Amino acid sequence: MEGRGFSGLYRNSSEELFLKTVMESPIGMPVPSMEMLGFKNVSQGFRADSEELFKRWLTNGEGYNSSSIGFSSRLSKRISTELVNGSNQLQVGVASDGRNNDKPFIQNNLLANDVSGDFNFPIRDPVDRELQPSNLFLAKAWFLSDQRMTRSRSSELRRRYSEMQNGLATQGIESICMDPQHGAEATKQEVANFNGYNYLSMCELPSQKGSFMSPSNSCSSNFNTPQFGDMDKVSSCVSMLKGTLQRRRLSSQLEKEAAEDDLNGIFYPQEPLFQTGFDQGQENWSNQTPVNVQVDSIGEVKDHGVLQTLEGSTNPVVDGFANQINQIYVGTASGEPSQSESSNAAPVISSGLDTCEGPINSNQTLCESSWKQVGVSKSSENTQNRVKGFREQIMDNLKDDKKRKSLERYGSITSAVSDDKGDTTKKRRVERSRKMAEAKERNSTPSVPSDMQAVLKRCENLEKEVRSLKLNLSFMNRKDSEQTKQIEDLQKQNEELADEKERLLEEIERILSETEKM
């Protein structure tokens, strides 16, 4: 019966799947949706997600303390559990009020996935769900042997595992410290709204051992590491996990932000800080002012002995940091370089904790403080020098452009081009420039009395008349010269005609004389 569930999905019809879901489920699941019937995420069931499988093993303890399940049964249930995972992704489980009215618990998608794959094991109380370290160690060993761990897959796995750890820790501390009447509802809302996943909080699994949630987010660390002690081992594991690639990514991101915002010297947040998972209807978290927060931080609020932790979901740079979990407060993860070359420093407990002033039972928790100015002195100096260099270069370019334009205007650069043009244009330009110079000289003369101005005006008019007369005389002289030339020609013709007349007369006389003789 280990292969029961939805293993025969592709050869069963939708009606059989619906009946099997309703009748075989021991935990009162809601009515299956279209995704559960196999009409949407069917193609995604062939390849099981290793990270989700790893989270389910860590959360549910490998089948609820059932060591008799073999590796073959786990492999047969991967397709069925992944198919049901698509339908219950955004649903909060139904509280089993009929079984135990005193101990309501949240049934999330992780619990429903493992139970839907194996129906031999009924639901037990949270007290009976003690996780055996041996089973968890076997699950982790099988996971490491099954999938080869590359840098990208390991970073993604560590990020998701650290998010799961932080969600469980903050929910548990909130449920302990907050009011009893608001504790259950707030925890349910936080579980329902935490990044789209539903996790069991620590307060609802009181019998979990300290080795369940290791402060280290590595895939090869020992599960028997104590949760709230021996911080040196945790820091060493975390420092071994962080690689040179993420450190370079962090430095490049910080340089980009410094280049953008360094004119004022302050980093301005690009994302909203303190994105809590509570709805707006709950007035306890309706008005919150973020204070004293740096990048990759989990803020902390103290109120005269009452501790309330706010999870800051600002992870813009490195999303693989494991936030250390202490019994009293949650610290910030610092990105200082460690001694090892290929790793970052271990997360250090931050001393810059935010405090909240006000009564304990107030509906609005007001956190007032000022932003920390991020210390980027070296990067700020570099960027300022770079900006100054750019500014000087731009000014030099503008000056060079002005000089070039002035030289072009005076003809010292484009003289060869101007020589190629015709003489007429050149003469015209020279004449125009001369006239403009004369006009400037006339305009620049000092002011004279009115009678002198009249005399000067009369003189100018006389000069104009003289010029016109000279032009007329020259024209007439030219005409006269032409006429005289014509007269001379006529006179020559007249003389020639007179000579011809005389010759003709002589010839007539000779002829008459000859006729008389005959």
From Swiss-Prot:
Induction note: Induced in nodules 21 days after rhizobial inoculation.
Q: Where is this region: Disordered?
A: 401-451
Q: Which residues form a coiled coil?
A: 452-518
Transcription as UniProt keyword = no
- What does the UniProt entry report for the null mutant? No visible phenotype under normal growth conditions, but roots of mutant plants are impaired in the interaction with both rhizobia and the arbuscular mycorrhiza (AM) fungus Glomus intraradices. Stunted growth when grown in nitrogen-limiting conditions and in presence of Mesorhizobium loti.
This protein's source sits in the domain of life called Eukaryota
State what this protein does: Involved in symbiotic signaling. Required for root infection by symbiotic rhizobia, infection thread (IT) formation, and nodule development. Probably not involved in nodule organogenesis. Involved in arbuscular mycorrhizal (AM) symbiosis. Required for fungal infection of the outer cortical cell layers, and for arbuscule development during the AM symbiosis, by binding, as a complex comprising CCaMK, CYCLOPS, and DELLA, to RAM1 promoter cis element thus promoting its expression. Acts downstream of CCAMK.
**Which PANTHER family does the record cross-reference, listed alphabetically?**
PROTEIN CYCLOPS
Please identify the protein, giving its name as recorded: Protein CYCLOPS
Which species is this UniProt entry from?
A: Lotus japonicus
**Gene (name only):** CYCLOPS
